[in-house]
Structure formats: C-alpha cells, structure tokens
C-alpha cells in the first residue's frame, strides 16, 4: 500500500463520472438499507463465532488464499490472483484503467448516492476490489465522490496486502478507511508465492481496523502472526495494534504472546519490525551456561543511527562474573567500511578470586627460589577486576590505486581469552594480538606499502614452561616492489626493497637487538617461451644493511651483506587426450627444473628480527631463499627437480586431478642457519615433497601433501583433507602433522626447562560439518583433537529446528583454556564448557540474529588475534 495513493480511494471514482443522473429521493431509503444490513451482520461472516479453534483458523486461511502444500517448509503458501502476480508493481490508481462489473440491478447518480449490487468487482492491473454491495456518496455541490461504503464479503487485493471484511467505509477527504470484522494478510516485496523474504508474511484478524491519511493502520482487538494460518505456532493478540509502514515498525498495546493456544507472556507495550528495514529496537535475547561464567542472559539493543552506520549494545548478566557489556559499531561510506567492538566487565568476581588465590601461592620466598615467576606475579599485582577487550577493523579505498587498513586490538589482561574466549566463540589459546596501520599503493608497475605494526603478547602464568614469544614491533616498515616486463627483447626488470625500524620490549625475555634494517634486491630476468615450455635465467643482487642501536656481544653497531643470486627456472609441457567410459579427458605432464646459486657468507653477526625456517613445502623447491625474512640468505648450489601432472575435463577444462612431486639436490652443504654456532647440514637431499588434489565426484574433494625426509627417515610434515560441499551440506576432516624443528626459530635463553619449548610436534585431527538432518532440522559441529597433547582443544555441536515462523537452536562448546595451578601448586588442564539456547519468533525480532559476541570476536580473531607468530 503506497502512502496516500491506495487504489480503493480512486478505482470506483473513475468509473462513476458521466453516468446518468437518477433521483436523489432514494437517499433516505439507502441509509435505512445500510442500517438494516449492519444489524444483520452483527453475526460476522468473516469472523464467525461458534467454530472450534481448528475450524476457525481453517476458515481464516481459506479467506486469505492459503493453499496447503505439505512439501514446502511452511506446508503451504498464499496464492494470489493472476492479475496481482502479473503486475507485482501496480501504478497509481488514478492513472490505471479500471473495469467495474456488478451482476445485480444498480443505480448510478452524478449527485447523491449510487448503488452497485451483487458481486461487485473492480479490477485494475495489480488491484482488485470485491463486495456484495457498494454505496458511493457524492458531494451535492461539486459532484465529487466523498465516501464509499462496501458491504458483504468485502475483499481488497493489492501487491502487498489482502484484506477480507464484513464492511468497509472509505472516505476520500481525508483519505481514510474503516473496516469491520476483518482478516488481513500483508507482506513486503514480491508476493510470497514468488519470493521468500523476511518477514515473509504477516496475517491476523481485527474487530475494527482504521487506515488513516498517513498510511498508518490501527487495529482494535487484533491478532498478528507470521506462521501458517491453519494452525499458528505463535501469535500475539492486543487490544490495539498499530502497523506503521512509514516507520517500518509495529506497536502492540496490552499484548499477549501465545504459543499455540496458550498465552505465555504479557507485555503492556511491545515494538516489533514489520519488514526487513533496519530499525532501532531490541533484538532476540539469548541465554546459556558456561562452566567458567555460570548462567548468562543477554538482551541486545540495536540502534540504527543512520543509513550508513549503526550500533548494537548488548548488556549480558553472568551469574558468576557479574555484568558484561558489549558494543559493536559498524560504519560504511563510499570509500571506507569497518567495525569497532568493545567488551567490558566492570567487576569480574571470578577474576578477582583467581588473582588473590594465585598471588597467595607465590610469596617472596617462592619467588626467590623460582625467579622465572617474578614477571608473571608483578603483572598480576597490577591487574584490576575491570576487564576489557577492544578491537577495530577499518578499510579505506581512496581510489583504484591507493588504500589503507587499520587493525587495532587491545586487552586489559592476558587471561581474558582464557576465561571468556570459548564463551565468545573464539580461541581460548590466543596469545598474540595484532595492531597495524598501513597505506598501500597498487599501480601498473609499482606497489608500495608503509605500515606501523606491533603485537600485544599475552603471558599467562600457567604457560611458564612454554611461554609466548614477544614480537618485534615495526615502527615503521616501508616496502616497495617494482616490475617492468620487456624493457628490452627478452628482458624483464624486477625490484623490491624494504626499510624497517625494529623495536622490542619485554619483561619476560632478555633484551634483544633493536635497530634498523635496509634491504634491496634488484634483478633482471631473461624469459624465453616456446610452444612446449620455457626457460628463464635470472640474476639478482641482494643487499642488506643494519644499524643496531641496542646490540649484544659479538654484534657490530653497523654491518652489511651483499650477495649475488643466480637461478634458472625451466619447464616443459606435454599433454594427451584419453577416454574413460563416455567422458573425454586431457592429461598433462609438466617436468620442471630449477637451479639456484648463492655464495656463502657468514651471517652470525647479524641479528634475527623476523626470519624463520618453515616446514618444507612444494613452493620451496623454487624459492630464492629457504628462510622467510631478510636476516638470513642461504648459501646455495642446488638443483630442484619437480614433476606436475594434471587431468582435466576435455569439455570444460575443469580440473579432475593435480599431482606434484619434487626434491632438491644439494651440490654443496648448507652452512647458513638461524643461530650462531649451529651445526651445518651435510645432507645432499631435501625432503621429498608430494601433493595431490583430486575431485573424484561432484561436490567431493581430496587434498593431501607429504614431505618425507630421507636423511632422517621421518616425516617433515603432512596434511590430508577430505571435503564435501553441496550447498547447505558441508563436511570435512583434516589431519595435520608438522615435525618439531629446534632450528626453526631462535631459542629463548631464560627458560628453566631444557630445550626449545617450540620444537615439539604439531599433530592435529580437525573435523567440521554443517548438515540438514531432516526437512526442518540442521546440525553443525566442529572438533579439534591435539594428538601430541592427547586432548581435545575445541569441540562444538549445534542443532537447530527451523520453520517458516520460528526456530529453536541449542549449542554446546567445550574449549581448552590452558593450564591452571591447583591448590597443591601443580599444573592442571582447564576447560570451559558453554551451553547456548535461542528461540526465534520470526517477525518479532531480527531473523537469525547471532549473539554479538560470537560474530565480533570471531571477526576480531580472524583479523589480528592469533596464536604464536613464528
């Protein structure tokens, strides 16, 4: 119903102009006839009494055009007349042609009252009016129609509404409508028959309905529901119900919420949405139980501040910890978008008890004997019961070349995620929070990025045997990459450079070197491509210089390194066609050879700011440096041999199978490593790496990789994943193993336990899935098992029953929260188990609104909250 232009005020007017005038003496008899009709219709045909509950709503469903369809989710649909479905967006009533038919005798006058009798039907494209009788009143002076009275089986159809009533009175000046004993069906957007939108449909009944000139509908003694009309699972009744399309909201006074036939809640006033327009108001509450926080209940409040930014405030009460306040601010402009999230606990009683208990176990005598605990205890003493987590993510696109990004994360104490991470939907093991501001340029030949980067490292006293590594800050870091192809025939130019100022602060690890590092690597390549392959010789000059402001013994204040790099990358391509059954395929064979030469230079005097040795991978066969970062450049005189084979569908080129295998043969021993005085490797072979990707059937995929070290007779790393993805049906299982490597990172020197705490194996089995069990049942699950530690790190299970008008979901999540000190001073595993429950009555709140905490914390953890940065 478009504001101020309802068809019912115009369609009859257009057809009455020009009719022959009859005597006005019949006016009194017409009025008497209307009164007589009113007395007869005190027993309503639209809302009959004396019917059973089931028969009554079957009657209402029939009036509103409900068609049973057991195979649909709602077990039926509202069928619209063909003239409505063919014209879902009708034009103004005053401009559309109209046809009026009536089977009985009629009296039409230019002044006074005109009468249309028996099956009166008025049609326009996208509009229909039906009634047993129609009385049209005209102004005696102007001849304009001022009022229309419809009596008996009144039906009003339009593209977003259907109303059935015993009687309707339509006044043109001002434009108002009054309906008696009405049943209504309203929806937004396309009719339900065509499109499923939220709220997909709303219907109800009313003893008295008024639509005023501002397009506001007021219903007296009315009901409202979005369920199927034959047996509504829920409905609300109210003495007064206001549906305002201008504000996109509904208001109910003295509202009773019914589940089936049973009233369960009374609200003196209730505000709810009547379309999918974002509007200020309360969202669906959620509740649950956590083993570390107790029972919790949250009631989110949504504030639609402007079309391009909004705020969600979620007060949450936890029986053990007290009040927890969460807020999410979202903003969007033509060039930028982002979120700001804050989680604040004004007085965490559980954390207060933890601090007091832990501090009592470490008196000065214990600290004197075990000084490793001193920084942990000092930090605990400074912490307060007020706890907070802040996260901000913002991206700006200035134009097609320039952009910026802001990632900010801060937590008041390192135990926040251990205590609340599982309940919030994130990781309880997170110990690195990224903070980064960068500016990027992406042009045709040049790319640039300047950034400020720092991590907040979380140190928990229960992790003293395997502490998190404090990270270097980059204040600032400038990186530039250039590429000019074809500067001459078969000559390409490459360039990359970086300038970084590394800063380091830590209370847990001794001071490390700080200073500036400058790196530059220009190169020239000579690509030659031919029909069955390619060969690309390349020559590079790798230059690195340091200016150390805080250095350790054996390190110089300034130092530099200049080394040449020479490599040859080459490959061949062969293919053949073959048939398997009725299908045609293409198989390729792609051998590849890569030679790399880098002379040796002792680099023990250089600091190690950010360089690590990652597990062996297929990409390392063709890398210029086995290390990531620029603090170490390997010596190399080596040849890589690799073979790739693909099987493609000959019809569309889609991949069926891809297999890779390769290894490196070292002509010289590798002498460069991360730590001074390390033992050089005298192996002639790298691990043998193999990869396989296979799509055996539609929706199925298998990926696997294995790096086997023949020198040590052990697996370097392996991963296997089997996945199924078919729309809403998703499942996968993964296995990941990485063998520990003591030379992968610098070993901290203050640990009182021997060896490198980070050299242990990584060995996990991870499985996840989302699956519709039945037509209305859905299940999701996630499981992460740590084989090395023989424990489940995370598992979660969720089940939802979903209908067209309500949904019920239940979830359980158990998260490993690290180690805690028991009363005897021993370390004990700690788990947090959270239960969640949510009932959604669709049409009374946001459809499927997830708790703010789960959404925002997961987003934050995907944008800067992680485990150790290696």
Curated annotation (Swiss-Prot):
GO terms for biological process: Gram-negative-bacterium-type cell outer membrane assembly; lipopolysaccharide transport. Keywords: Cell outer membrane, Membrane, Signal. Residues 1-25 form the signal peptide. GO terms for cellular component: cell outer membrane; transporter complex. It comes from the Bacteria. InterPro entries: LipoPS_assembly_LptD, LptD, LptD_C. Its main location: membrane. Disulfide bonds: none annotated. It is found in: Cell outer membrane. The keyword Signal applies. Together with LptE, is involved in the assembly of lipopolysaccharide (LPS) at the surface of the outer membrane. Component of the lipopolysaccharide transport and assembly complex. Interacts with LptE and LptA. Belongs to the LptD family. HAMAP family: LPS_assembly_LptD. This is LPS-assembly protein LptD. It comes from Coxiella burnetii (strain RSA 493 / Nine Mile phase I).
């Amino acid at each position: 119903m478009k504001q101020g232009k309802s068809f019912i005020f115009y369609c009859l007017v257009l057809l009455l102009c020009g009719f022959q005038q009859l005597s006005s003496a019949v006016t009194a008899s017409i009025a008497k006839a209307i009164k007589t009709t009113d007395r007869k219709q005190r027993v309503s045909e639209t809302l009959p009494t004396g019917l059973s509950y089931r028969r009554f709503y079957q009657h209402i469903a029939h009036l509103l055009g409900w068609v049973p369809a057991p195979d649909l989710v709602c077990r039926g649909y509202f069928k619209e007349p063909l003239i409505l479905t063919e014209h879902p967006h009708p034009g103004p009533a005053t401009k559309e042609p109209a046809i009026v038919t009536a089977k009985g005798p009629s009296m039409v006058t230019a002044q006074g009252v005109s009468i249309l009798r028996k099956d009166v039907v008025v049609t326009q494209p996208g509009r229909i009016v039906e009634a047993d009788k129609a009385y049209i009143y005209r102004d005696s002076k102007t001849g304009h129609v001022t009022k229309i009275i419809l009596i008996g089986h009144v039906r009003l159809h339009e593209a977003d509404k259907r109303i059935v009533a015993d009687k309707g009175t339509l006044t043109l000046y001002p434009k108002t409508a009054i309906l008696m004993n009405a049943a209504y069906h309203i929806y937004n957007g396309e009719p339900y028959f065509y499109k499923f939108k939220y709220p997909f449909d709303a219907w109800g009944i009313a003893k008295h309905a008024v639509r005023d000139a501002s397009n506001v509908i007021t219903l007296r003694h009315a009901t409202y529901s979005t369920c199927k009309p034959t047996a509504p699972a829920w409905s609300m009744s109210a003495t007064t119900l206001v549906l305002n399309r201008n504000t996109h909201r509904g208001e109910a006074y003295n509202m009773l919420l019914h589940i089936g036939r049973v009233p369960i809640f009374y609200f003196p006033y209730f505000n709810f949405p009547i379309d999918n327009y974002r509007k200020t108001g309360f969202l669906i509450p959620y509740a649950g139980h956590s083993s570390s926080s107790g029972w919790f209940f949250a009631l989110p409040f949504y504030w639609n501040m402007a079309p391009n930014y909004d705020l969600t405030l979620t007060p949450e009460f936890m029986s053990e910890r007290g009040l927890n306040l969460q807020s999410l601010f979202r903003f969007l402009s033509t060039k930028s978008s982002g979120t700001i999230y804050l989680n604040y606990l004004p007085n965490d009683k559980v954390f207060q008890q933890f601090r007091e208990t832990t501090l009592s176990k470490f008196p000065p005598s214990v600290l004197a004997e075990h000084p490793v605990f001193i920084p942990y205890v000092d930090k605990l003493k400074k912490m307060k019961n007020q706890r907070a987590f802040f996260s901000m993510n913002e991206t700006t696109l200035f134009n097609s070349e320039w952009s910026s990004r802001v990632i900010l994360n801060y937590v008041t104490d390192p135990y926040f995620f251990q205590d609340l991470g599982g309940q919030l939907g994130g990781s309880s093991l997170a110990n690195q929070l990224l903070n980064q501001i960068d500016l990027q340029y992406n042009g045709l030949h040049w790319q640039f990025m300047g950034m400020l980067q720092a991590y907040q490292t979380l140190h928990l006293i229960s992790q003293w045997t395997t502490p998190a590594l404090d990270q270097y800050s980059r204040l600032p870091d400038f990186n530039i990459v250039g590429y000019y192809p074809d500067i001459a025939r078969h000559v390409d130019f490459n360039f990359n450079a970086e300038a970084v100022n590394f800063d380091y602060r830590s209370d847990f690890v001794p001071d490390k070197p700080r200073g500036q590092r400058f790196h530059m690597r220009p190169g020239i390549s000579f690509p030659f491509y031919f029909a069955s392959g390619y060969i690309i010789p390349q020559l590079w000059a790798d230059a690195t210089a340091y200016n150390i402001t805080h250095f350790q013994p054996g390190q110089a204040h300034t130092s530099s390194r200049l080394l040449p790099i020479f490599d040859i990358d080459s490959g061949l391509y062969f293919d053949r066609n073959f048939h398997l059954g009725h299908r045609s395929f293409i198989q390729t064979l792609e051998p590849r050879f890569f030679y790399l030469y880098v002379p040796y230079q002792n680099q023990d005097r250089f600091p190690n700011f950010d360089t690590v040795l990652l597990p062996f991978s297929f990409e390392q066969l063709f890398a210029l440096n086995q290390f990531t970062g620029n603090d170490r450049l390997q010596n190399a005189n080596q040849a890589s041999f690799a073979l790739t084979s693909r099987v493609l569908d000959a019809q569309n080129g889609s991949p069926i199978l891809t297999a890779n295998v390769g290894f490196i043969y070292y002509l010289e021993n590798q002498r460069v490593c991360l730590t001074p005085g390390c033992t050089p490797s005298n192996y002639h072979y790298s691990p043998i790496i193999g990869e396989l990707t296979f799509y055996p059937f539609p929706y199925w995929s298998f990926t696997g990789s294995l790096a086997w070290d023949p020198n040590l007779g052990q697996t370097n790393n392996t991963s296997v994943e089997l996945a199924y993805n078919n729309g809403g049906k998703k499942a996968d299982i993964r296995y990941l193993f990485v063998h520990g490597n003591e030379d992968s990172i610098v070993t901290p020197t203050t640990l009182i336990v021997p060896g490198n705490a980070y050299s242990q194996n990584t060995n996990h089995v991870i499985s996840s899935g989302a699956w519709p069990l039945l037509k209305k049942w859905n299940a999701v699950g996630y499981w992460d098992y740590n084989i090395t530690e023989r424990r489940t790190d995370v598992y979660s299970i969720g089940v939802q029953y979903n209908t067209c008008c309500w949904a019920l979901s239940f979830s359980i999540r158990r998260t490993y929260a690290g180690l805690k000190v028991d009363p005897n001073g021993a370390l004990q595993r700690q788990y947090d188990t959270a239960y969640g429950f949510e009932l959604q009555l669709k049409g009374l709140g946001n459809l499927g609104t997830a708790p703010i905490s789960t959404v925002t914390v997961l987003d934050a953890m995907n944008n800067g909250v992680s485990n150790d940065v290696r």
